[in-house]
Design a protein with these regions (language model features):
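Conformational switch/transducer regions in large eukaryotic molecular machines and scaffolds
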Residues: 14, 677, 699-702
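Amphipathic, well-packed alpha-helical segments that form the structural scaffold of globular domains
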Residues: 23, 458, 462, 513-517
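Charged, amphipathic alpha-helical regulatory modules used
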Residues: 1-110, 717-722
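Contiguous, well-ordered alpha-helical segments that form the cores/surfaces of helical PPI scaffolds
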Residues: 299, 505-518, 538, 698
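Long insertion/accessory domains within large nucleic-acid-processing enzymes
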Residues: 684-723
Length: 723
């Protein structure tokens, strides 16, 4: 059994430390109030049993809470008072040096919490450590100086989650849709260097990767680009190559048809070379965030402005999917699944039915998904129904990064819809499980507590908004001055972009399943519990609309992915309420509105059921189905894609893509338990060295490849197949 020290280091559990601490507290009181050696040993044993029952590494603070409770249970009030006083004095000492120990432990690679925090960061690398060091300082400043103490306390206790406090000290926003079209067509500036409109497709792609890196270094959330914005440069290259071929063939007896063949062959070669940087540079770039950019590439034929551009876009999409299917090579030279870029493919009327002109692209996408877990899929049909602007027109567009969707918006200056160049200000998430447990199952109390917690989230969201107010465009020129998000003047404040629907701000939620299960005794898939689940969703939407109307800001409801926070929430719930069977007996809580990962339900029923809840998450959400190896059953994959097209706006298929560098095993790397800790192990050779294992799993929208904390690992282990 392990214990997590205050600096984040994970060490073996030592019962003698409990015995020593209680003995010192007991010796501080006189006479009959002192405990016998047997009583002290019993207390230590009881605490040890409680820790083992949690089936995870516990923190020092949790152990001390358990000791206090044991002392109070046996009426040892004087000893408990001395124990609590000692804790308080030590706490005051620590407050004089709030970050030193944590920073030193992460530099020495001893901080287990940091090691497991982000599935796409390697905390042993210097550049990542620098980001984490800055993050520790930011979190400390946020907690001590920048945030309302009530919000800080609620965050620490797991009532809410104030996202990305490791970046809150700076004036940074969350995620966005990069206006690559504006930057490529009208030029941009990168690091003080003017970049003019590119004269070839490959150059456009190279510039795009530089833009991606610059944008990622100036925000903390994901970004999305569209391949449509690169499509015009295919014809630029075609004409350039055609002129070169004409010059080469001048005076030779070469037919026009033969010349066209040569042009198309060279053009295809350039498209291949152009797409490669988007794949390879993105996964090898290191931004100031200490990781590869969280980039999503959008593939939507319906965005093309004319027939030629659509045909050229199809070529780019085909090449992008082919390269992703191939993968990237690991250190051993073996092709593996990369985490980025995330790919989103739009299912539409001319690519979803056999015989459609672009059906071959959907078949290729299905083949790639079966092997590499991407692309994910948006249904144009369903999105046009759900994303309707004030003029009654439906729109299809990509999410910002993983799942955060903008609200429909009509530019008041042009009267046209606008999506690229818009962004999200930030997220605060409510823990629905805590609301339910705090109510004790009383519905009247539930709604009262729910409103109190939502009001707290609202205040926290206002703090995020106020942190951006007054930000000069000079803070991030690539974003605010040179086209990624706007073309503001130097020194101009970004304030006008924070109101009127141009940007969004998100109320996140997590644990709907556990919330409903506790209040009704049933899963929200049960007909008797579903109405309550929908009423919870509607209530949060009503609050967002109320705040939006009062403040002229686009509050929207967001299905929080909870990559590492799922573990934090679970630990906080266990601390506050103990082990409640079926509710807090796991080291994770369920993402957003999802069906519980262990619930047996088929893929089609799951997608249909969750589509009703996705509709009520306008600020972002994604559904998934867990599938076995489908590489030899692409017909089944295509049937799922057809179902997605007809029934749900945004969904993905999860499979497994692993490799053991020690023995060459390329099947599923298993999760096994060792002394109360979940570890990854090759079932063929027993290798547990994470540096010699390539494991790719869907974390929560993105693919993770750097392993996960104990809560998320348990959630991955508990997943059942839906197909």
């Amino acid at each position: 059994m392990k214990i997590i020290k205050r600096n984040g280091a994970e060490v073996p559990f030592d019962i003698t430390k409990i015995i020593t601490a209680v003995t010192k507290a007991s010796d501080s009181v006189g006479g009959k109030a002192r405990l016998s050696r047997e009583q002290i040993t019993d207390i230590a044993a009881a605490v040890t049993d409680q820790c083992q029952a949690l089936n995870r590494a516990v923190s020092v603070e949790e152990v001390q809470d358990m000791v206090e409770n044991q002392l109070m249970d046996i009426k040892a009030h004087d000893i408990a008072r001395h124990y609590i006083t000692y804790r308080y004095i030590q706490s005051l000492k620590r407050q004089t040096n709030t970050t030193d120990e944590r920073i030193l432990s992460l530099i020495e690679c001893q901080n287990e919490e940091v090691k497991q925090e982000n599935a796409n960061k390697n905390p042993t690398v210097n550049s990542v450590q620098r980001d984490y060091m800055a993050g520790e300082i930011s979190k400390d400043l946020t907690a001590r100086l920048l945030l309302d103490p009530e919000i800080v306390k609620a965050h620490q206790e797991g009532l809410i989650h104030f996202h990305d406090s490791d970046y809150f000290a700076q004036h940074m926003h969350n995620c966005d849709l990069v206006n690559l079209d504006d930057m490529l067509q009208n030029g941009t500036v990168i690091s003080g260097t003017y970049i003019e409109k590119p004269h070839s497709f490959s150059t456009a792609c190279n510039i795009a990767t530089q833009i991606i890196a610059q944008v990622a270094s100036n925000q903390y959330g994901g970004q999305s680009i569209s391949l449509t914005h690169l499509a015009p440069f295919v014809d630029v290259s075609r004409k350039k190559i055609a002129a070169e071929v004409e010059a080469e063939m001048e005076g030779l007896d070469v037919s026009d048809e033969r010349k066209r063949e040569i042009v198309e062959r060279r053009l295809r070669s350039e498209i291949n070379r152009g797409v490669q940087p988007i794949q390879y540079q993105v996964v090898t770039l290191m931004t100031t965030n200490g990781q590869a950019p969280f980039i999503t590439v959008f593939m939507y034929l319906g965005e093309a402005r004319n027939a030629q551009e659509k045909a050229d876009l199809a070529i780019i999409i085909e090449e992008t999917i082919r390269q992703r299917y191939q993968g990237v090579k690991n250190e051993a030279g073996v092709w593996i699944t990369p985490a980025f870029p995330k790919l989103i493919y739009v299912l539409e009327e001319d690519n979803i039915h056999p015989g459609d002109p672009y059906y071959y692209l959907t078949e290729l996408a299905a083949k790639c998904t079966a092997k590499r877990m991407v692309p994910d899929y948006i249904s144009e049909k369903k999105m046009l129904e759900l994303k309707v602007d004030k003029n009654g027109e439906g729109h299809c567009y990509t999410c910002m990064g993983c799942r955060s969707f903008l609200t429909p918006y009509v530019d008041p200056e042009t009267g046209k819809p606008k999506y690229y160049g818009r962004f999200n200000q930030g997220v605060v998430t409510i823990n629905l499980v805590d609301v339910a447990l705090s109510s004790g199952g009383n519905f009247d109390k539930f709604w009262k507590i729910f409103d109190e917690r939502l009001a707290l989230c609202h205040r926290a969201l206002q703090a995020r908004h106020k942190r951006l107010l007054g930000t000069p465009s000079d803070a991030a020129p690539i974003l605010w001055q040179y086209g990624a998000l706007a073309r503001l003047k130097k020194g101009e404040k970004i304030d006008k972009l924070l109101f009127g629907g141009y940007s969004t701000i998100s109320l996140g939620y997590a644990g709907l399943y556990e919330c409903v299960k506790y209040m009704t005794g049933k899963s929200h898939t049960d007909a008797g519990a579903k109405p309550f689940a929908l009423s919870v969703m509607q209530h949060m939407n009503d609050k967002c609309n109320e705040w939006k109307k009062a403040e002229n800001m686009d509050y929207s409801l967001y299905g929080t992915p909870l990559e590492s926070t799922t573990y934090k929430f679970a630990k906080c719930l266990q601390k506050r309420f103990g082990i409640v069977p079926g509710i807090t007996d796991k080291n994770y809580i369920t993402n957003s509105y999802h069906v519980h990962v262990s619930e047996h339900i088929d893929a089609f029923t799951k997608l249909k059921f969750e589509s009703e809840f996705q509709k009520l998450s306008p600020g972002g959400a994604i559904s998934y189905v867990e599938v076995p190896n489908m590489q030899d059953n692409l017909e089944a994959v295509m049937s799922v894609l057809q179902f997605i097209y007809d029934n749900i706006m945004y969904a993905e298929l999860n499979t497994k893509s692993d490799y053991c560098q020690c023995c060459g095993y390329d099947g599923e790397i298993k999760i096994v338990e060792d002394d109360g800790k979940l570890v990854w192990e090759c079932p063929k050779c027993g290798n547990r060295d994470q540096n010699k294992l390539n494991v790719a799993r869907r974390t929560c929208g993105y693919i993770g490849t750097q392993f996960w904390n104990q809560g998320r690992t348990q959630e991955i282990k508990d997943r059942v197949l839906h197909l």
